[in-house]
Amino acid sequence: MLLVVQTALELGFLYAPVALALFLSFRVLDIADLTTDGCFVLGAAVSVTLTAAGHPLLAVPAAMLAGACAGFITAFLQTRLSVPSILAGIVTNTGLYTINLMAMGWRSNESLLGSDTVFTLLRSTGLGGDWYELVLAAAVTLLCAGLLALFLGTRLGLSIRATGDNPDMVRASSLDPTFTVTVGLCLSNALTALSGAMVGQYQKTVDINSGTGIVVIGLACLIIGETMLGRRTVYKGILAALVGSVVYRFIYAVVFYTKVVPVECLKLLTAVIVALAIAAPGLRRWAAFQKQKHSRKEAA
């Protein structure tokens, strides 16, 4: 059972940057960025390829840089070519399939068996003991969350937040929303690629289809965290993304361990939960309207 808890914590922290990325794009910028699935695989592909070449430490920032480039393309399509945000993400995501194959040497998967990773390098130092993978995953994710919180409190970070709230006000303040959207999407996709890079080295493998459904899982983590902690402030939203990711992985582990729901159906269940959570405000308004309508009929 302890192994189940340890694995759930490790995966929770490893996938948390995806939830942070979606918090930045979906909540802060109010943009539905669908580059996530392809960008996750891009990060893993770059990381695994460089790690196999003997550069596990260089692999992580290189993967983040590749993710930022993917975010830049999405932002360019959206801001310069006036492509709707959803379509811009779909176009970039489609193109990334070929880029990811190219990064893996035109193979659909790649393995790191026999290669050193950032995790094995930490194990060789003796730090963390048997929990070395959790220590590294938690340290990287918490560092990213802290830096993101600090960044969103800077002048540029406040401009990005303002762009999501009211782009017209940003223009009236002599700020360029094109620049703030571009920076925000580059940063969010860099976080997604970071998650892919760490997961690739953690699992010692990458597959071209390993990113399928990542955007839905990230949204589920974000929504679970917001349900538990709320999202009244940016800092609470960041914390909610972290907590939600860990809780989601615990739910996944319990389902996998107890077999309450077939594991094959878990992504379907995740999609239903996300759909209901997103539709919740509209459903509440509909329920209130029906209740008011029923009360008027009784009064008449």
Language-model features, listed with the residues they occupy:
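Single transmembrane alpha-helix segments in multi-pass membrane proteins
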Residues: L3-H55, F76-L81, I223-R231, V272
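Alpha-helical transmembrane segments within multi-pass membrane transporters and channels
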Residues: L22, H55-T94, I99, T141-A145, ...
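Short loop segments and helix-boundary regions at transmembrane helix junctions
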Residues: R27-A32, F72-T117, L122-R123, R155, ...
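Helix-loop-helix "hairpin" substructures at the membrane interface of multi-pass membrane proteins
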Residues: A70, D130-V215
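Cytosolic-side transmembrane-helix boundaries in multi-pass membrane proteins
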Residues: D165-A172, D176-F179, R232, L239, ...
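Loop-to-transmembrane alpha-helix initiation sites
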Residues: L11, I86-L87, S108, E133-A137, ...
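Transmembrane helix-bundle core of multi-pass membrane transporters
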Residues: S85, N93-G153, V183, C265, ...
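Transmembrane alpha-helical segments in multi-pass inner-membrane proteins
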Residues: T192, G196-K267
